[in-house]
């Protein structure tokens, strides 16, 4: 994956496809007509640049971004998300020299590996099929903490009405931190004796 840094603004038309039930935060004086709302998801901007790269002749695409998303106008209604997106192909198979289409298992592997790097082990989460509407039903999943209290991320094929043959994943860093803070194992404090240390050397005949 190549890292991408984009605006926190995006086009309201594409943002509406990803906002679900969230509130659109409109900008009073946007710098451009296609950057007129704060993004509810990182996907709109990633899709924009992915398609732009494809139009310039770049074939395989795998890009990601770490940045803020906005769920409302009030203070604190901002979330930090890791989002990655892949288009169409993976690396060539050295044995057959043919390119293999990406499937949901490839993007799931990317998500699981990312969670592992962030300190979440495989036995700390389960996969459910309750994903947002911008994912393809049946070709996507939601990663939920083992206690069922936190949605750590989503992965899968993006809905073909939005973009075809494209897979992505999201990791919600605040949820990850909240889960870890509530399930951290604290070691017992080390207790020292009030008495001086002494050693004895016994010899028996």
Question: What would you call each of these model-derived segments?
Answer:
Residues 1-205:
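Extended beta-strand-rich architecture
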């Amino acid at each position: 994956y190549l890292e991408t840094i984009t605006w926190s603004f995006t086009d309201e038309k594409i943002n509406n496809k990803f906002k679900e039930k969230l509130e659109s935060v409109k900008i009073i004086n946007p710098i451009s007509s296609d950057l007129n709302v704060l993004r509810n998801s990182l996907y709109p901007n990633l899709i924009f640049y992915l398609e732009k790269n494809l139009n310039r002749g770049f074939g395989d695409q795998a890009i990601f971004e770490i940045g803020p998303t906005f769920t409302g106008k009030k203070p604190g209604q901002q979330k930090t998300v890791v989002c990655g997106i892949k288009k169409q192909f993976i690396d060539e198979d050295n044995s057959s020299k043919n390119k293999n289409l990406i499937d949901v298992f490839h993007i799931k592997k990317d998500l699981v590996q990312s969670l592992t790097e962030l300190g979440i082990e495989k036995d700390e989460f389960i996969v459910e099929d309750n994903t947002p509407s911008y994912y393809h039903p049946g070709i996507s999943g939601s990663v939920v903490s083992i206690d069922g209290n936190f949605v750590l991320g989503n992965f899968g094929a993006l809905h073909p009405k939005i973009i075809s043959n494209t897979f992505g994943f999201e990791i919600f860093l605040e949820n990850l931190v909240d889960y870890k803070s509530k399930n951290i194992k604290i070691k017992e404090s080390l207790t020292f004796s009030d008495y001086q240390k002494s050693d004895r050397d016994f010899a028996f005949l």
